[in-house]
């Protein structure tokens, strides 16, 4: 068991980690919301899907900002946050199919959200939520509940989307931009996690060094007392 003071210090450390992490995630949701004009440039096939993506991205941005200000949330809140992420990416799959950019986005978001303290000890819960978000649209398409966004042909995988038109230069630009955005956001988030881990490791090394110095000083003082 640890004392109350140590517990509060650990809790504060977790809160700081959540704040930093959600602050890094905030621009990503705004970036997703900014795709609405790009979707309109391609040609909207489903306004409810387009508006739903924009609205949910903005809602997730608000949730991320709230986490930066009040990081100590319940498990239920964080599960809702994870479900919101999975649902947002599932909606994104309606624009270009689930096999083009979406798997990379799911991998990036899962790797990002799992670093929250709530999911460090509940990784399988998070992975279950994310896998459900990836597989649900595919299953619903197979059942005929949702319009198909892809099919397999002799030439390979044919993606045609349901939320926007997929043809011509706008679509090429959109796919490239979405891929670049995913790579950049993943790189920035990984750099943030690595930087935080490196800083924590350095603090431990310095503290261990200081303790060794203190221990050596105590030993020398004790030896002087014995010699005296």
Regions found by a protein language model. Name each.
Residues 21-28, 163-189:
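Extracellular-loop-to-transmembrane junctions of the mid-late helices
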Residues 135-149:
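C-terminal TM-helix exit segments that contain a strictly Trp-centered aromatic cap at the helix terminus
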């Amino acid at each position: 068991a640890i004392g109350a003071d140590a517990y509060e210090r650990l809790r504060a450390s977790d809160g700081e980690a959540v704040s930093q992490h959600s602050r890094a995630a905030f621009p990503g949701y705004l970036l997703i919301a900014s795709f609405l004009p790009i979707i309109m440039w391609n040609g909207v096939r489903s306004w409810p899907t387009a508006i739903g993506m924009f609205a949910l991205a903005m809602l997730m941005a608000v949730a991320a900002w709230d986490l930066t200000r009040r990081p100590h949330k319940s498990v239920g809140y964080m599960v809702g946050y994870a479900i919101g992420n999975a649902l947002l990416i599932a909606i994104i799959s309606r624009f270009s199919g689930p096999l083009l950019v979406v798997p990379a986005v799911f991998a990036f978001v899962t790797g990002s959200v799992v670093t929250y303290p709530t999911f460090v000890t509940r990784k399988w819960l998070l992975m279950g939520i994310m896998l459900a978000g990836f597989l649900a649209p595919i299953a619903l398409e197979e059942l005929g509940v949702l319009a198909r966004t892809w099919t397999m042909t002799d030439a390979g995988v044919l993606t045609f989307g349901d939320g926007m038109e997929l043809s011509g230069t706008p679509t090429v630009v959109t796919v490239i931009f979405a891929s670049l955005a995913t790579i950049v956001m993943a790189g920035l988030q990984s750099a943030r996690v690595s930087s935080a881990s490196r800083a924590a490791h350095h603090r431990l090394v310095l503290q261990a060094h200081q303790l060794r110095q203190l221990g050596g000083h105590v030993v020398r003082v004790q030896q002087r007392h014995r010699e005296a």
